Amino acid sequence: MPRNKDLSAYTALVTGASSGIGLEYARQLAAQGANLVMVSIDREDLDREAKKIVDTSGVSVETICMDLAQPDAANKLYDHCRQKGIQIEILINNAGIFSFQEITHTDPKKIETSNLKLTTATAYKIRNLCCCNMLWNRGGSFTTFTVTT
């Protein structure tokens, strides 16, 4: 991400935004003036971190608490933004699933269904929805991370 670039005319959608890499992307984008749509499954952390970002940078932050591994999550997220009149110019597709159990104690079907939906299908759909809009408006950028631990 370019440093010291004025992003005040842009809105960034960041998934997995309540912690880790997603949160740091949100902080850096806000520091450069970008308004944010922060998405996470963890409402408490999401609201706390969004408030910190607003307090330190003064940008507008929309928070959406959503499980992106659920069916039709990408469409629901995109529709929410459209209904609020939010135009996404920057997409940071970062949501992931972190399991703190030993792999031998984790149901392989659960990993397969939820993790693959989140890191592949939903990320792909969100990217396509946002990119179509970016192309229509002649600009934008996206980054996708797929992390599993």
Language model features by range: what are they?
Residues 1-12:
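Flexible N-terminal pre-Rossmann segment of NAD(P)-dependent oxidoreductases
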Residues 15, 88-96, 144:
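Rossmann-fold scaffold of SDR-type NAD(P)-dependent oxidoreductases
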Residues 19, 96-99:
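Flexible cofactor-recognition loop at the NAD(P)H-binding site
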Residues 75, 83, 98-112:
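Conserved mid-core segment of classical short-chain dehydrogenase/reductases
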